[in-house]
Amino acid sequence: MQKQAAGSIVFVSSQIGLVGHPLGAAYAASKAGINGLTKSTAVELAPNSIRVNAVAPGPVVSDMTAKARADKKRYNSLLAGIPMGRFGQPEEIATIINFLLSEASSFITGQVIVADGGFTAH
């Protein structure tokens, strides 16, 4: 990318890296680290026209959330914290990543785009 003086890097973080989670300190710390890496690398690579961003999904329908979704009480508790009232779909996260990789986001760098149905809004 540096030889081409162009490109885009997209990291996958998590909204947990922004708000923390009980019993999830290591995971939260790793995702917070990605957020810092995103911003620092964006500043470092911007002179080479390389953009660096991250997407931070909230709960998404996936293998990672399968146990929580199978436990009705836990699932309803999680949904109560999401203003949009549902888990995200993998395709929704992929759409954001595709946008960040495209020229449509040519003036966006150093950002962590949160896609969590409004969870971190309150």
Predicted segments with their positions:
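Active-site helix of classical SDR
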Residues: 30, 38
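Short, flexible catalytic-loop segment of classical short-chain dehydrogenase/reductase
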Residues: 18, 56-67
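Residue(s) in the substrate-gating loop at a strand-loop-helix junction
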Residues: 14
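Alpha-helical segment proximal to the catalytic Tyr-Lys
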Residues: 43-47, 106
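Hydrophobic structural elements of the Rossmann-like NAD(P)H-binding subdomain
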Residues: 10, 52-55, 65, 110, ...
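Active-site "substrate specificity/gating" loop of NAD(P)-dependent dehydrogenases
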Residues: 18-24, 29, 46-47
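A short helix-coil junction within the Rossmann-fold of NAD(P)-dependent oxidoreductases
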Residues: 1-8
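C-terminal helical subdomain
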Residues: 54, 73-104, 108, 117
